[in-house]
Amino acid sequence: VLPVKESFDLVQRDIVIGGKKSSFFFIDGFTKDDTMLKIMTSFFSVTEEKMPDSATEFSRLLVPYVEVDTLSEFDGIIKNLLSGTTCLFVDGYEACIVIDCRTYPARGVDEPYNDKSLRGPRDGFVETIVFNTALMRRRIRDPHLIMKMTEIGESSRTDVAICYMDDRVDQELLKNLNSRLEKIHVDALRMTQQTLAEELFKRKWFNPFPKFKFTERPDTAASCLLEGKVVILVDNSPSAMILPTSILDMIEEANDYYFPTITNVYLKVSRALITIATVFVTPLFLLFMQNLEWLPEVFAFVAIKDTVNIPLIFQLLILELAIDGL
């Protein structure tokens, strides 16, 4: 079933353990070489008299490693192997010994380029999901912090972690989210979180507002968890999805958590006013220019008195396209 000869990175290593033929299967690049060397070296000293009768006893007595399990279902074995774990088959055993000594190519947890902060920690999420969960677990050492792992995608089988505080989260929201996740049937999360977001909240009408807040900072995600929100982590993505969210959440920044209350309120109010001005100033300007009699005398100086060859609405559209093109 496994294309060992066709795929160069799928490795099969045959050895003899206690007089029984055995085979290691693992993916090159996903396994810690030094750990595998120590495990295989320990098997060379096993004699026939020391060989247990079952795979469970073998994993408990002879495998010198912490994360060890046994699997008998073929689909589960294939899924674990393709996820990076090492599978050991021993002649005469009905189950496979699964050794989780995998490692992933990963960069350092440096500060995010697009989500910097003047104060606070300088670490950020990376593309490896277990590193991201560890960064949040380090900040919230509470048994109520739940990180539920699931898989989405028939081909990709992408790991998705649902993180929440079970004593603070809205249970109805959590139930609705789990129900939506179970109904997702896609071949793969090609664009990771963006694909997941589109599958979670499908709408038949156009909504320009974002449905999630994204952050690449573990401290921001941890703060949202403590507020009772849900954080979704997707493997191969260096950002977290936060829900529920609102327009007020979109004008928050990481610096807000580290400034005094007065400064925090001032910055949020400033961003809110700027957001409102961005939405309403341009259409109001167009409205008053087309109806000068409505323009208050205080703002009479902004009136366009010269004749223009291009209508104002087209001027604004050209300006918008020029700004977007830069």
Question: Predicted regions: what is each one?
Answer:
Residues 1-280, 294:
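Membrane-embedded alpha-helical signal segments
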Residues 261-325:
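Core alpha-helical transmembrane segments of integral membrane proteins
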